[in-house]
Amino acid sequence: VDKPDYRPRPWPRPN
């Protein structure tokens, strides 16, 4: 089974 690529992205934190 091919797993989706889960990569930690630098999401902009909602201040």
From Swiss-Prot:
User: What domain of life does the UniProt record list for this protein's source?
Assistant: Eukaryota
What turns on this gene?
By bacterial infection.
- Which Gene Ontology cellular-component terms appear in the entry? extracellular region
Q: Name one GO biological process term.
A: defense response to Gram-negative bacterium
Keyword Chloroplast present in the record's keywords: the answer is: no
- Report the function annotation for this chain: Antibacterial peptide active against Gram-negative bacteria.
Protein name in UniProt: Metalnikowin-2A
Organism of derivation: Palomena prasina
